């Protein structure tokens, strides 16, 4: 079965090939017939031209030297001069017209009889009526084609174009690589510069002032307004550390408050920076400002519910040493509570004017109520001052 199929397939292929051969032969025959017809039409056109020349010997034609007059006369089936001759009584002109009409009818097989009067060029001749224009040269920077067009020349020009394109692409790749390398170098150069700027932009830490105060309240009211912005656990201590910031616009003072793990009654308050604004004239809440000289064992009178503003001072007696000293710039202060509920409050120092105000010592005489108390009389109302003075005088009298 397979052999039969193969044989059938071969027969079909042979038949197709034979058909193709026949078609090509018929095409060739048709082309030859067309060429013969063209030769016949050319011969008839040449005979027509000869007849026109002979007719012009008996009857002169008005032939112009330019091509436009020739085409005008040839476009008409009968030249204009023949109509003029027909109006005359010449018998030969009528016969010539009939002869020319017969010749024009015989040449009607051609495409246009207006151009049949002119001899067509022979295909056998190598010369042509139109001159061949030179083909455009291949655009390349390396190879210039001056030879006539041929299959070999086209292959050379195409290879030269490909070589030029390869060179251009290679140059573009190298330029791109160089640009990428430059960009990477610029980025590497800018990164360390940015890091250096960031390091230099860090602000220097301002001086810190630490105070130790015995109090049950963590956030002591010192007259300024504070805003809590964070809290952090302290290592090896059950008490957290709170962070506060001054609420006045443009003031960067910070405060840290934490309770001591060794003595829970002590509150450590650390101030960082200095206030850039005046002290508030009306502090919040009731603030008891208790000042008195340090007596024999540091007992000064105060109510158990009130507390004092931290006022740093270096001049402390041997009986009242500071609990801790933090930085070189920091100042230590102790408010110690006695057995009867009183506080020990050292006086102010000129080295830290932002947290304390100077007060003169209260005397036992009655003139103490008339004595000038400095800035305190502008801040505290008169009732608070009179109450503190009265309590001091009463306790001194008891002693």
Curated annotation (Swiss-Prot):
Compositionally biased region (Low complexity): 143-161, 184-193
Alphabetical keyword list: DNA-binding, Nucleus, Transcription, Transcription regulation
Pfam families: WRKY
Biased composition (Basic and acidic residues): 1-11, 19-38
Region (Disordered): 1-57, 138-202, 361-399
Residue ranges, compositional bias (Polar residues): 162-171, 383-399
DNA-binding residues (ranges): 215-280
Role according to the record: Transcription factor. Interacts specifically with the W box (5'-(T)TGAC[CT]-3'), a frequently occurring elicitor-responsive cis-acting element.
GO annotation (BP), single: response to bacterium
Subcellular location: Nucleus
GO molecular function: DNA binding; DNA-binding transcription factor activity; transcription cis-regulatory region binding
GO cellular component: nucleus
Name of the molecule in the record: Probable WRKY transcription factor 48
SMART domains: WRKY
Matching InterPro entries: WRKY_dom, WRKY_dom_sf, WRKY_plant
């Amino acid at each position: 079965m397979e052999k039969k199929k193969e044989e059938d397939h071969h027969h079909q292929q042979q038949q197709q090939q034979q058909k193709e051969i026949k078609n090509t032969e018929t095409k060739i025959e048709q082309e030859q017939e067309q060429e013969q017809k063209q030769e016949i039409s050319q011969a008839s056109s040449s005979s027509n031209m000869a007849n026109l020349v002979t007719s012009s010997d008996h009857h002169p034609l008005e032939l112009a030297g330019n091509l436009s007059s020739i085409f005008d006369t040839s476009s008409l089936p009968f030249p204009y001069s023949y109509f003029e001759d027909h109006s005359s009584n010449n018998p030969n002109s009528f016969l010539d017209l009939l002869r020319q009409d017969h010749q024009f009818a015989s040449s009607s097989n051609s495409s246009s009889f207006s151009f049949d009067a002119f001899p067509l060029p022979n295909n056998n001749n190598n010369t042509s009526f139109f001159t061949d224009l030179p083909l455009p040269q291949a655009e390349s920077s390396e190879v210039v084609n001056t030879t006539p067009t041929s299959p070999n020349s086209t292959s050379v020009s195409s290879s030269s174009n490909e070589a030029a394109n390869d060179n251009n692409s290679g140059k573009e790749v190298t330029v791109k690589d160089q640009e990428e390398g430059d960009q990477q170098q610029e980025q590497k150069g800018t990164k360390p510069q940015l890091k250096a700027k960031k390091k230099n932009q860090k602000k220097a830490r301002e001086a810190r002032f630490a105070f130790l105060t015995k109090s049950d309240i963590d956030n002591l009211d010192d007259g300024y307004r504070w805003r809590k912005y964070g809290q952090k656990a302290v290592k090896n201590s059950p008490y957290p550390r709170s962070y506060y910031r001054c609420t006045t616009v443009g003031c960067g003072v910070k405060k840290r408050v934490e309770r001591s793990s060794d003595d829970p009654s002590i509150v450590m308050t650390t101030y960082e920076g200095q206030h850039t604004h005046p002290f508030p004239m009306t502090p919040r809440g009731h603030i008891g400002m208790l000042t008195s000289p340090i007596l024999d064992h540091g007992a000064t009178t105060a109510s158990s519910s009130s507390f004092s503003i931290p006022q740093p001072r270096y001049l402390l007696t041997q009986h009242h040493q500071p609990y801790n000293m933090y930085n070189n710039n920091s100042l230590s202060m102790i408010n110690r509570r006695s057995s009867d509920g009183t506080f020990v409050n050292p006086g102010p120092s000129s080295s830290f004017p932002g947290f304390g105000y100077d007060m003169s010592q209260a005397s036992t005489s009655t003139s103490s109520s008339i004595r000038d108390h400095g800035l305190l009389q502008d801040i505290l109302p008169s009732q608070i001052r009179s109450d503190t003075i009265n309590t001091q005088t009463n306790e001194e009298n008891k002693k």
